UniProtKB/Swiss-Prot annotation:
Keyword Signal set for record: no
GO CC term (a single one): cytosol
Record organism: Helicobacter pylori (strain P12)
Gene: glk
GO molecular function, one term: ATP binding
Record-annotated disulphide pairs: none
Name recorded for this polypeptide: Glucokinase
UniProt KW Kinase keyword: yes
Pfam families on file: Glucokinase
GO BP term, pick one: glycolytic process
UniProt-annotated location(s): Cytoplasm
Keyword set, alphabetical order: ATP-binding, Cytoplasm, Glycolysis, Kinase, Nucleotide-binding, Transferase
InterPro entries referenced in this protein's UniProt entry, alphabetically: ATPase_NBD, Bacterial_glucokinase, Glucokinase
Length: 336
């Protein structure tokens, strides 16, 4: 089928909290972008139908090709979201939406593909020197959960994305303060993963743990209604609540440790890329936060890590971009 006959293509980036939808009407041209809350819809199909009804006026043709990036492992036809209530069959959903092809990929596979096509102004560099062109790239990002993937270049120049669930590795405390935070989390959960702290809910968990630290009993604290990631971040930056600043500093330090662990494991001299909606909200603070110092605090491997650049993805819709690139690869090569 000629490529022009595959447009518009239905794209989705589905996380734990929000589902983003868009229509790719031409290569890398995405229109009618909408963000829907997952909790407002009983199923993915309901959300898609609602989205398409909103875009009815701009739709000249019904999409017959779709690509959905979802924040959960893909292990066959049945998909169960990790951080929301949606479950679905890929084939049943394809039929329900009358699509010729529905590609469903992990959200951080989509993020990796998006990074392969990004321009310099889509990224904010945090330390390091230059990326090695053919070296592995590590992609991770705190959001509702914590995603991790790897982008490598094959010998023929093509790209390969390795999906993973690195957000669920066991968290390793770095110092006494992080041991305290870990102990608090361990009292609540059987397994304390990196995602427990490096996510939106993780900010709240760190705050709760620190609020019980000896010596902080009498400092100004947030009310229960104010215990949200957004408010903790805002209070941290305006300086009114030292405990919120300590929370954000601890979050960034922990992220530095994990990013370094991933970079060392992969030999990611192609760079580390931080995705997700959390860090861009406080990018100016993040540039001077404890993140980079902690990233390089790896003993004998400090010099190795000091050369690796870390980039914060500032682009608004990388998940949709990556879903579109993955679908393009599939249509051209019958693989992603």
């Amino acid at each position: 089928m000629p490529k022009t006959e595959t447009y518009p293509r239905l794209l989705a980036d589905i996380g734990g909290t929000n589902a983003r939808f868009g229509l790719e009407v031409a290569p890398r041209q995405i229109e009618c972008i909408e963000v829907l809350r997952c909790e407002d819809f009983e199923s993915l199909s309901d959300a898609v139908r609602f989205y398409l009804s909103k875009c009815k006026e701009s739709l000249k043709l019904h999409p017959i090709y779709g690509s959905f990036a979802v924040a959960t492992p893909i292990m066959g036809d049945f998909v169960q979201m990790t951080n929301n209530h949606w479950t679905f069959s890929i084939e049943t959903t394809r039929q329900c939406l009358t699509l010729k092809k529905l590609l469903v990929i992990n959200d951080f596979v989509a993020q990796a593909y998006a990074i392969s096509a990004m321009q310099e102004n889509d990224l904010a560099q945090i330390g390091g020197i230059k990326c090695e062109i053919n070296a592995p790239k590590a992609i991770l990002g705190p959001g509702t959960g914590l995603g991790v993937s790897t982008l490598i270049q094959n010998s023929d120049g093509s790209l390969k994305v390795l999906p993973g669930e690195g957000g669920h590795v066991s968290f390793a405390p770095f110092d006494d303060l992080e041991i305290l935070v870990w102990q608090y989390a361990r009292s609540k959960f059987n397994h304390v993963s990196a995602e427990r702290f490096l996510s939106g809910s993780g900010l709240v968990l760190i705050y709760e743990a620190l609020s019980k630290r000896k010596g902080l009993e009498k400092v100004a604290k947030l009310s229960k209604a104010e215990l949200t990631p957004q408010i903790i971040s805002e209070r941290a930056l305006n300086g009114d609540y030292p405990i919120c600043r300590l929370t954000l500093d601890t979050f960034c330090s922990m992220l530095g440790t994990l990013a370094a662990d991933v970079a060392l494991t992969l030999g990611a001299r192609g760079g580390v890329y931080l995705c997700g909606g959390i860090i861009p909200r406080f990018i100016d603070y993040f540039k001077t936060s404890p993140f980079r110092a902690r990233f390089e605090t790896k003993g004998r491997m400090g010099a190795f890590l000091a050369s690796i650049p870390v980039h914060v993805v500032m682009k608004k819709t990388p998940g949709l971009d990556g879903a579109g690139i993955a679908l393009e690869n599939y249509l051209l090569h019958d693989k992603i």
